[in-house]
């Protein structure tokens, strides 16, 4: 979760940062942990079961609450530090609105649906754009098509494997645990 938190935070802010300062890594991790803690906070009972099934460790509601509130506090404090030190430039108001919107989505949707909405819309699509720029120096239609052609087989194998796993396991609770383990591995 910590590595995935860093990854999510980095992807969100990498284009907004202009430094290699070590504080950025802390900020990326804090922001990503805020995203995870909002998901965990919004679906506590399911998260407790899934974490227990995956790790055989029991996490309590109290732990999830502390994680949530401490993630809010650390992200707010570090946001001000980032702005003050001019390590990242972003619109604080826009980020607050985005976080509130995500929190509402996580509270309305199921655990999987909420995570999927975040993962696809707020993480994967911007990440694909960043990957295309990294691989081809710019984002344009030709480079997008080239990227999609090179990736489609990998994506199809992954999706087909996930469906096969779903039917082989034939246990929804176990599948959800495997699904989140799979997502953690690819992140």
Segments the model singles out, each with a brief description of its role:
Residues 1, 105-115:
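Transmembrane helix interruption/hinge and helix-loop junction motifs
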Residues 25-38, 95-106, 149-153:
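Small-residue-rich segments of transmembrane alpha-helices in multi-pass membrane proteins
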Residues 118-135:
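Predominantly late transmembrane helices and immediately cytosolic-facing juxtamembrane segments
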Residues 149-163:
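Hydrophobic membrane-spanning alpha-helices of multi-pass integral membrane proteins
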């Amino acid at each position: 979760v910590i590595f995935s938190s860093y990854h999510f935070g980095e992807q969100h802010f990498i284009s907004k940062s202009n430094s290699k300062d070590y504080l950025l890594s802390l900020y990326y991790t804090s922001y990503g942990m805020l995203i995870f803690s909002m998901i965990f906070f919004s679906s506590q009972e399911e998260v407790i079961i899934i974490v227990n099934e995956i790790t055989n460790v029991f996490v309590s509601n109290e732990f999830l609450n502390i994680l949530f509130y401490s993630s809010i506090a650390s992200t707010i404090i570090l946001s001000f530090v980032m702005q003050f030190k001019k390590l990242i430039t972003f619109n604080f108001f826009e980020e607050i609105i985005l976080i509130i919107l995500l929190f509402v989505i996580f509270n309305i949707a199921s655990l999987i649906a909420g995570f999927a909405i975040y993962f696809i819309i707020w993480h994967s699509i911007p990440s694909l754009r960043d990957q295309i720029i990294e691989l081809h120096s710019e984002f344009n239609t030709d480079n997008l098509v080239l990227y999609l052609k090179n990736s489609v087989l990998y994506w199809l194998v992954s999706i087909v494997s996930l469906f096969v796993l779903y039917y082989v396991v034939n246990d929804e609770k176990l599948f959800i645990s495997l699904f989140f383990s799979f997502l953690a591995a690819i992140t």
